A protein has these predicted regions:
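A short, structural micro-pattern
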Residues: 3, 21, 83, 126, ...
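Beta-strand-rich, repetitive solenoid scaffolds
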Residues: 4-13, 18-23, 28-35, 58-61, ...
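Domain-scale recognition of soluble eukaryotic interaction modules
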Residues: 120, 126-165
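Terminal beta-strand-rich extracellular "head" domains
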Residues: 73-129, 133
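Glycine-rich, low-complexity segments
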Residues: 3-52, 94-99, 105-107, 156-165
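Substrate-binding and catalytic surfaces of secreted/luminal carbohydrate-active proteins
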Residues: 67
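Surface-exposed ligand/attachment interfaces on beta-rich extracellular proteins
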Residues: 11-17, 39-63, 72-97, 141-151
Length: 165
């Protein structure tokens, strides 16, 4: 467990715009500034499904460039075809780092879902937004399409990703 050292507190300054940490007593630099903190709600725009109106309000917290989002997807309708299930994000994601994916950490808990997949996980893709990746034993990876989710399936989703700014 790390602790905040007292010398770090002495070298911390606050202004109307930022909280700055100076670890060596020298001039403060932008890399050590926490100038952006925000929390709120937003309504994701979904493709491939229509979310139950009671679950349209998702939450987010943004600290610096890290954004954590969470909410519930319970489709009230699907296009029941090969349309990818995806949504926009409250903040533009950073450029892709590897394999076309942005830095993402997330999880999905499900209820009332009848899938033959080994698992699902949310991913963030620059220029696309949030997609749900399906994991199939010995068959690779794919993206969830509207025909693989049914009305009233419940997906509780949490994702942390890097924003562009």
């Amino acid at each position: 467990m790390s602790r905040l050292k007292t010398d770090a507190i002495r070298n911390t300054s606050a202004s109307a715009d930022a909280l700055t940490f100076d670890t060596n007593g020298n001039t403060k630099i932008a890399d050590n500034e926490l100038a952006d903190y925000e929390e709120g709600t937003w309504t994701p725009t979904w493709t491939g499904v229509t979310n139950n109106a009671s679950y349209n309000s998702w939450k987010y917290i943004k600290i610096g460039k890290m954004v954590m989002i969470w909410g519930t997807l319970i489709p009230s309708a699907t296009t029941n075809d090969s349309t990818d299930v995806k949504s926009d994000l409250p903040f533009t994601q950073a450029a892709n780092h590897t394999n076309g994916l942005a830095q993402t950490v997330g999880s999905i808990s499900t209820h009332h879902v009848n899938w033959t997949k080994e698992g699902v996980t949310p991913i963030i893709q620059a220029g696309v937004g949030m997609r749900i990746q399906e994991i199939q034993d010995d068959a690779g990876l794919g993206y969830m399409v509207s025909s693989s989710v049914a009305v009233n399936d419940q997906l509780m989703i949490t994702v942390t990703y890097e924003a562009a700014t």
